[in-house]
C-alpha cells in the first residue's frame, strides 16, 4: 500500500479520542443502570427489613396505614384465650403499654404466657393487631441488650 491509501483513514489520535468517549459513555451508562437497580431493590425491600417494635413504640401512623410490622414484647400472663379451633387472642406487653393480638393458626411450641414473643402482622381498621406469624423466643438472645434489659426490669422473663 502506498501513502495515498492512508489519507482516507481517520488519524489514530481521533480514533483514540472516539474510543475514550465511547468507554466513558459505557461506564456512565453502567453506573446509571446500577444506581437505578440499587434504588429499586431498596424500594422493594423497605417493608421486609423491619425489626420489631414494642407496644409503646407503635405510632398512630402504624395503626392507620395497615402496613406489615413486627410487634415484640412479652405475652401478658392470664390473657391467652383460645377462641374456636385455631383463633387465639392475647396481649403483648412492654413496660408502658400492651396491645391485643388476634392470631389464626398454630402457635409455636415455645409460646407461653410470660415469655418473649414477636408477632408479624398489621393493624386492622379497628386498631386491632392481626397476627400472621408468631415467633416465640426461648430467651432474650434474639433482642438487643437494651431491649432485654428494659423488659427484664419491668417483667419476669423466663
Swiss-Prot record:
Keywords: Cell inner membrane, Cell membrane, Cytochrome c-type biogenesis, Heme, Iron, Membrane, Metal-binding, Signal-anchor, Transmembrane, Transmembrane helix. Its main location: membrane. One of its GO terms (cellular component) is plasma membrane. InterPro entries: CcmE, CcmE-like_sf, NA-bd_OB-fold. It is a single-pass type II membrane protein. One of its GO terms (molecular function) is metal ion binding. One of its GO terms (biological process) is cytochrome complex assembly. Residues 1-23 are cytoplasmic. Residues 45-158 are periplasmic. It comes from the Bacteria. Heme binds at residues 138, 142. The keyword Cell inner membrane applies. The chain crosses the membrane at residues 24-44. Disulfide bonds: none annotated. It is found in: Cell inner membrane. Heme chaperone required for the biogenesis of c-type cytochromes. Transiently binds heme delivered by CcmC and transfers the heme to apo-cytochromes in a process facilitated by CcmF and CcmH. Belongs to the CcmE/CycJ family. This is Cytochrome c-type biogenesis protein CcmE. It comes from Bartonella bacilliformis (strain ATCC 35685 / KC583 / Herrer 020/F12,63). The lineage of its organism: Bacteria, Pseudomonadati, Pseudomonadota, Alphaproteobacteria, Hyphomicrobiales. The gene is ccmE.
Amino acid at each position: 500500500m502506498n501513502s495515498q491509501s492512508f489519507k482516507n483513514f481517520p488519524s489514530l489520535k481521533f480514533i483514540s479520542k472516539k474510543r475514550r468517549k465511547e468507554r466513558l459513555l459505557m461506564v456512565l451508562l453502567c453506573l446509571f443502570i446500577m444506581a437505578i437497580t440499587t434504588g429499586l431493590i431498596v424500594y422493594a425491600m423497605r417493608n421486609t427489613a423491619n425489626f420489631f417494635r414494642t407496644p409503646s413504640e407503635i405510632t398512630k401512623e402504624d395503626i392507620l396505614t395497615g402496613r406489615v410490622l413486627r410487634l415484640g414484647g412479652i405475652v401478658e400472663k392470664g390473657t391467652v384465650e383460645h377462641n374456636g379451633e385455631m383463633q387465639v387472642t392475647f396481649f403483648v406487653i412492654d413496660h408502658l403499654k400492651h396491645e391485643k393480638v388476634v392470631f389464626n393458626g398454630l402457635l409455636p411450641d415455645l409460646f407461653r404466657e410470660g415469655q418473649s414473643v414477636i408477632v408479624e402482622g398489621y393493624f386492622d381498621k379497628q386498631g386491632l393487631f392481626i397476627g400472621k406469624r408468631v415467633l416465640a423466643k426461648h430467651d432474650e438472645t434474639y433482642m438487643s441488650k437494651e431491649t432485654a434489659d428494659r423488659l427484664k426490669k419491668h417483667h419476669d422473663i423466663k
